[in-house]
């Protein structure tokens, strides 16, 4: 019997969170980003994985470049992970990069920066971008936002 080998990978993830209940698994929410990633992994490989994200986004929030770490307990390459997720994930979640990392690397501690962007439309937005901002149909006092 061989020794079980634990491997860690850094993920860079982009997602449209419109149809999700946020990043983190929740008892009363069926559709979360991490839940979708973990269940897709299990469907592809028949085994569970552990995923930790650098941030927990709320329901409906999007991310470009969310850092996460996946822990697996079998020998697999970043390329194999990428192919499986690219094939099975819904189109609103994309793994942009997968790299092996040591068990010392942690997404919460080692993320170098976080940028939050809020988009407010003061005119009715185009339907192709409307879900990525908030429409405010009154005068906007920018000084109160800073």
Where are these regions (language model features)?
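Structured-RNA-binding interfaces characteristic of tRNA pseudouridine synthases
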Residues: 2-146
